[in-house]
Regions:
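A short, solvent-exposed loop/turn motif at the edges and junctions
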Residues: 44-50, 73-86
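Extracytoplasmic beta-strand/coil segments of soluble accessory domains associated
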Residues: 138-170
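Face-selective signature of the C-terminal outer-membrane beta-barrel domain
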Residues: 290-318, 341-490, 511-520, 570-575, ...
Length: 762
């Protein structure tokens, strides 16, 4: 009896100690002196073995969880060792025994939902799951619910802002330099609130795991792609960390970027009472050489203070496009044909300098300051030669553009009434200049030399408050925005294009979560300004049958958006209704001077709705499919024409996990015929697949994209004008990618990049 009570007392004391532990840490060892590196450590609920969290152990066998140990079990597995289950404790030393028979490279991880909603954000945990073995961040994103198969768009919201460890991503190539096994989690915020730019409709947060050890680390990636042409790309990343100081260098080069495509365009319109049908078809060839380098430093001054700076330079060293077309024209029953050859060469260079300072004064108050300067310069020269039966003509248009942008962003974060208050100031100044000229002196057509410049000063102050009430979470935001825009033609201020805007932009959201069931309702007002090239009034040559002109008097679009999201287990429903006041509509009209059409943009208000349903289960522990069905409907009428045909689509993603660390990905996406703005997109389907083998610090992937060579095709109809295009990109393309990493250590740079809206417009 005494032994029974003693045992019961020991259990009670052990449970009490575990309940008081607020964190769990330990090491995985083979014996007292040999650690087991990179073991899979999972935290489970003791009551039902439900998955709580997971990590990959360090090279020294260490692991940790930021949660208490009460009522939890630690599961540890590693290739070549027996899997063990132990009660969780604050400090653990776990010894693994070699398995009697190796598991042939099979790593079993707990089944978990693909996503869940936490405080209004959709969260997908990557660390310790099969997603962490897919290669690169781009490969992970392509397989996640709510993300398009191209990995760069949020379904129903478009291209998001991306933050990597709280650092604003400047170049999409950065995603190709993050190994998937370094990603802790991915969060999608579809209600960013007032603290971001006025046009931001979604924010993607990628958090990487804390690197193990110090010293020099890096990765090298080489990729070879072939379709009808060859394409060679390479990336090299180096990172040196010593205590709190962190130096990093990221580089990439695309030395042989070539492509070949076939294109056909058709135009039907009336010119001065005569019916005109014109088309051209032929081949195009592109070739480019590009490079990118980014260097930076981060200094963790104390546990609460850090600062850093980054310089990034990207350049298109050469970009040439060669097009050969056969033109056919029927004008009032008379037929003619001629040949056109267009040769275009271009270059550009971009400089970006950013710096940040972060100070967590206390647990209830912090400061983050960012500053950014960006300078861009580009030039292009085109030679267009026409060979007709009776003559030969030449056109040599050239374009030069230059821009500068300076911005700062100051954000304070305070704890107020058990909630979080973000408030601050963002300012920016932007200059964009574009020159367009015709270099051949014998030209006597419509195109004129023009030199136009845009200047804008902008500022906004914001406050964003968020708080949890049990299972409820609410967010309230308010932003005041001031914009002063000026447009200059040939150095003279255009009064009719000068304007000042003052906008008050609210945002509100309410969400509810219980276990694996979540709801969210939100309302936001967004503003979106046209790109600076869209605001340029200069006339530009596209083809013999088409010219383009900007519109300096375009107003910013103010979009009212109401969104509803719901999730239950592996099901997710997203609905979004938006009304765009002064939205930009693409239009065509017949020119007065010559038989050709002119494309331009105008402001016109209309509404739209997007609804999508996703299902992302796991079957047989090795197959992770994801289906997403969506429909988009707009109510757009302009100039007597209706553009309201709904468009529906489907995405089907598949990830299959095989023994010996082999992975197969098969993704398909397609859409039915329907309107997007004034453009009627035709039905299409795109299928891609890959097979990958992982080997410690090395992985190899063989992939094929656009297996059935889906064509780009569609048309637009206006009053008296019909245009269509068809593009064959000569695919599928086959690629081989090899990646090697050593002592991986991702940078801790925490800058968020001020002026993200202006960088997008430029």
């Amino acid at each position: 009896m005494r032994n029974r009570y003693s045992g019961l007392l020991a259990i009670v004391l052990t449970s009490s100690i575990c309940a008081n532990a607020q964190s769990i840490d330990g090491k995985v060892m083979e014996n007292d002196s040999i650690p087991v590196p990179y073991a899979t450590v999972s935290l489970l609920q003791a009551s039902d073995s439900a998955y709580v969290a997971g990590v990959i152990g360090g090279e020294d066998g260490s692991f940790s969880f930021d949660t208490n140990s009460s009522g939890k079990i630690v599961k540890v597995s590693c290739i070549g060792y027996k899997t063990v289950f132990l009660p969780a404790a604050a400090h653990m030393t776990i010894h693994l025994l070699p398995s009697e028979q190796a598991l042939q490279g099979v790593t079993v991880t707990a089944s978990r939902p693909s996503f869940k909603m936490e405080q209004g954000q959709f969260v997908t945990h990557i660390q310790g799951t099969v997603f962490s073995q897919l290669g690169l961040a781009t490969d992970v994103l392509q397989q996640l619910p709510l993300i398009d198969t191209d990995g760069i768009k949020v379904l129903g919201r478009g291209v998001p802002l991306v933050y990597i460890n709280n650092k604003r991503m400047r170049n999409w190539n950065e995603l190709t330099r993050i190994p998937s096994n370094m990603i802790k989690d991915v969060k999608i915020d579809m209600n960013p609130g007032a603290k971001y730019g006025s046009s931001v409709r979604a924010v993607l947060y990628i958090t990487t795991i804390k690197p193990v050890g110090e010293g020099l680390g890096g990765s090298l990636i080489l990729s070879e792609n072939v379709s009808s042409c060859w394409n060679t790309t390479g990336w090299l990343d180096l990172n040196y960390r010593r205590r709190g100081l962190d130096f990093f260098v990221n580089t990439s080069a695309n030395t042989f970027s070539n492509s070949h495509y076939k294109r056909q365009d058709v135009y039907d319109f009336q010119y001065k009472g005569q019916d005109i049908h014109a088309d051209y078809s032929g081949d195009g060839y592109n070739s480019a050489k590009t490079g990118f380098v980014s260097v930076g430093v981060n200094d963790q001054l104390t546990d609460r203070q850090s600062l850093g700076a980054t310089y990034t330079f990207s350049r298109v060293f050469s970009n040439s496009a060669d097009q050969n077309y056969r033109n056919h024209v029927w004008q009032n029953g008379a037929f003619s044909e001629f040949d056109t050859r267009s040769t275009q060469s271009s270059q550009n260079g971009n400089h970006n300098v950013s710096a940040y300072y972060e100070n967590k004064f206390s647990d209830k108050f912090s400061l983050n300051v960012d500053a950014t300067y960006a300078h861009n310069r580009a030039n292009s020269r085109q030679i267009v030669v026409e060979n007709r039966m009776d003559n030969r003509s030449m056109l040599v248009p050239a374009t030069k553009s230059e821009s500068d942008m300076v911005a700062q962003r100051t954000v304070f974060t305070s704890t107020v009434a058990n909630g979080k208050l973000d408030y601050g100031l963002v300012t920016s100044w932007t200059r964009f200049q574009q020159q367009y000229c015709i270099e051949n002196e014998d030209y006597s057509g419509l195109l004129k030399t023009n030199d136009n410049e845009s200047k804008q000063s902008a500022a906004h102050v914001f406050a964003n408050y968020s708080r949890s009430f049990g299972r409820w979470f609410t967010q309230l935001g308010l932003k005041y925005e001031y914009i002063d825009y000026k447009y200059y033609a040939a150095g003279k201020l255009r009064d009719e294009s000068k304007r000042t805007f003052r906008n008050l932009l609210p945002s509100v959201s309410l969400s509810y979560s219980q276990d694996r069931f979540s709801l969210m309702l939100s309302y936001n007002i967004y503003t979106n300004s046209s790109s600076y090239s869209q605001l340029d009034d200069g006339l530009q040559y596209i083809s013999d049958f088409r010219y383009n002109k900007g519109n300096s008097q375009l107003q910013p679009t103010k979009k009212h958006s109401v969104a509803f999201n719901a999730s239950y287990r592996d099901l997710l429903l997203i609905c979004n209704y938006s009304y765009g006041k002064d939205a930009v509509v693409s239009c065509f009209d017949v020119m007065d001077e010559i038989p050709a059409v002119l494309s331009y943009g105008v402001n016109h208000s209309f509404s739209s709705v997007y609804t999508g349903l996703s299902y992302s289960p796991t079957f047989f522990k090795i197959w992770r499919p994801s289906w997403h069905v969506w429909i988009h409907k707009q109510w757009l009428s302009y100039n007597g024409m209706e553009y309201g045909r709904p468009q529906a689509g489907l995405q089907w993603k598949n990830l299959v996990v095989l023994p010996r660390q082999w992975y197969i990905v098969l993704n398909a996406s397609g859409n039915l015929k329907g309107h997007s703005n004034t453009y009627m997109a035709q039905s299409s389907i795109n299928v891609g697949m890959s097979i990958q083998k992982n080997m410690k610090n090395l992985w190899v992937k063989l992939a094929a994209s656009n297996l059935f060579n889906a064509k780009e095709k569609g048309y637009s109809e206006y009053n008296g004008v019909y245009t269509s295009h068809w593009v064959d990109n000569r695919q599928p393309s086959i690629s081989l990618t090899i990646s090697y990493s050593f002592n991986p250590a991702k940078s801790k740079y925490k800058g968020k990049t001020a002026g993200e809206d202006e960088l997008r417009r430029l």
